[in-house]
A protein has these predicted regions:
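Phosphodiester-processing cores and adjacent nucleic acid-binding clamps
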Residues: 1-166
């Protein structure tokens, strides 16, 4: 399967156009194997902070999981791992072979690394006017063209904020 990333996603902050919450969108994108996603709400950036913070939180949790699984993998490989029946998180390990435990660790390490690599792309679907702001023309100017603008880096993000705020 080829990599695919949505570069034009509306959230609940796009009135009449989007209804999905940011956590559900991010979770679904990660579950579907996407390496990133761009939030481009209509004429606003109200969901950008929530989007960025949620991805940051997901990555933080994945980093903790990665460390846990890497430590467990090292113990299994060295022959020092013995599942403790008293620990809830180790009950499923009882009776599994070393190869099964190694495969499980490697699978979970790969999953955690994938989440850590997820890229939040910040953007906006802007409205492009037919005329200058001083030369408005009633109905014609109420229907405009749309332009998807994505921030490439922090400077681009700040420029995007300036554009949306005008």
């Amino acid at each position: 399967m080829q990599d695919f990333v949505h570069l034009h996603v509306h959230t609940q902050y796009s009135v009449l156009d989007g209804q999905s919450s940011i956590p559900r969108l991010v979770d679904k994108a990660i579950k579907n194997g996407m390496r990133g996603m761009a939030v481009t709400d209509h004429g606003n950036m109200m969901g950008i902070k929530e989007f960025y913070n949620y991805v940051k939180k997901k990555k933080s949790g994945a980093k903790d999981e990665l460390k846990k699984w890497e430590d467990k993998l090292a113990l299994i490989e060295s022959g020092q791992y013995q599942p403790d029946p008293a620990r809830k998180d180790q009950k499923d390990d009882i009776g599994k072979s070393k190869e099964e435990l190694l495969a499980l660790c490697r699978k979970n390490i790969e999953s955690a690394r994938f989440v850590i690599s997820f890229k939040p792309i910040l953007g906006c679907e802007m409205y492009v006017a037919h005329h200058k702001m001083t030369d408005r023309n009633g109905k014609e100017d109420q229907s405009g063209w749309h332009l998807i603008v994505l921030a490439k880096n922090e400077k681009g993000y700040h420029n995007l904020i300036k554009l949306v705020s005008r």
